[in-house]
Amino acid sequence: MTTFTHINHQGEANMVDVSAKQDTVREARAEAFVRMLPTTLNMILSGQHHKGDVFATARIAGIQAAKRTWELIPLCHPLLLSKVEVNLTALPEISSVRVESICKLSGKTGVEMEALTAASIAALTIYDMCKAVQKDIVIEQVRLLEKSGGKSGHFIAE
């Protein structure tokens, strides 16, 4: 049975010691969906939103969030990210925005939490910018899509 890496033998939470690990190239992709009314999505896409460019703001928020993940999640290591990318795609057929984030580095620990944080905060930023016109926006399906590098190998979500 696999054990939790952040829990010591006394059951206490601790930051994992990665000092003996070798640096490897690590990459992670995550996604989130933001579901809204078609009128709200059209407002974003037409540039008619009174707060400005929703996608540009969400993209920058996601990038900033990835860089600050270690400050938000208590046992995450501060990482020297070499790449953070946040892509937003309008999906009018399901009245949603898909947020995809990609984080990469060469280091001793993975970037899954950074990718998940980037996607989550970008989605929350879309909500924040649009809540004046629609309060019941739904953020859903936040998940890790893929991770590579490190001892645990390559993971691809089904």
Curated annotation (Swiss-Prot):
One of its GO terms (molecular function) is GTP 3',8'-cyclase activity. The active site is at residue 128. It catalyses: (8S)-3',8-cyclo-7,8-dihydroguanosine 5'-triphosphate = cyclic pyranopterin phosphate + diphosphate. GO terms for biological process: Mo-molybdopterin cofactor biosynthetic process. Substrate binds at residues 75-77, 113-114. Belongs to the MoaC family. Catalyzes the conversion of (8S)-3',8-cyclo-7,8-dihydroguanosine 5'-triphosphate to cyclic pyranopterin monophosphate (cPMP). Homohexamer; trimer of dimers. This is Cyclic pyranopterin monophosphate synthase. The gene is moaC.
